[in-house]
Amino acid sequence: MSLYSALFRSIIRTLELIPYTVLFKIGKLVSYFLYVLPNKHKKISNANLKQVFPGLKETELKKLLKLSLFHSLMNLLESGLVWGNKIYMKKIDFIEIENIEALDNSLNSNKGVLLFTPHLGNIEILINFLGSKFDCTIPYTPPKNKSLESIVTKSRNNAGVNMVNTDSKGIKEILLRLKDKKIVAIASDQVPKTGAGVYSKFFGNEIYSMSLLPKLQKNTGCIVHLMYCKRKKNGEGFVICFDDPIDLSGDIQKGVDNMNNEFEKCIMKVPEQYSWEYKKFKKTKLKSIYN
């Protein structure tokens, strides 16, 4: 085991020992310094929020930025929770599930099910839930840090999730799983590689967006649901939500437009919990907003 790997594991074990309500308070305190001190997370988040919410007053924008930095930090502080022994899954009422009936109905329809989510709340909570309840496959791009990759991959595999790379081999595996009437889950709000998407509006801005979902639905006839995870107030836990089925098939452009529209509606429910520190507008017809 490398020094970095040992360090990562020690941090995760330490964070796992801290009660979640205490982690929540730590997040509130530390995120204040993220807000007042210069840093790249603050810079990118602020640029994204200004682009998406140009009509916000300065005071409202600052409040949203501060909350956004808190929730971004919580994803880090929750690493012990989601990548450790996952004891939280046994706590009564810590995880609430909304509209699971919609997913159950789709699973009983003798078709594959494609779930997609934005990076909102903590998607590792979603992954752990899906792995504990269903035969689920998830495509992902491995982290560049090999030590972190080892921890993440082991945790997700232990959760019961089948992880595949986002290469041609992985896409073939996804197609097979959907045709075999299984579940595939994708965080499809990230900017895809050139050739793997189309330009589509996101909060009124033309951005390069993933076109994989409408292609998968068209090729397999699977049922598509948006799902997301949001934090409860005051460190009380999480809520996992499943929306009713939506149609992304047919014309690829229309399918991607519908996907982004669903993202917008989802994000507006808890805009402070979306990962605004990600460079969502790095491939766009607009002038770069990150300079």
Where are these regions (language model features)?
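Membrane-anchoring hydrophobic helices of lipid-metabolizing enzymes
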Residues: 1-114, 158
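Catalytic core of membrane glycerolipid acyltransferases/transacylases, capturing the structured
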Residues: 109-168, 195-197, 201
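Hydrophobic (often cysteine-bearing) scaffold residues that line and stabilize catalytic clefts
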Residues: 61, 144, 148, 255
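Conserved nucleotide-sugar phosphate-binding/catalytic loop shared by glycosyltransferases and other
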Residues: 65-68, 163, 170
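Non-catalytic C-terminal accessory region of glycerolipid acyltransferases
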Residues: 37, 56, 63, 105-108, ...
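A conditional alpha-helix N-cap/helix-loop micro-motif detector
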Residues: 93-97, 145, 164-167, 206-207, ...
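Short, composition-biased local secondary-structure segments
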Residues: 14-18, 121-127, 175-189
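Hydrophobic alpha-helical segments typical of transmembrane helices
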Residues: 10, 22, 45-48, 126, ...
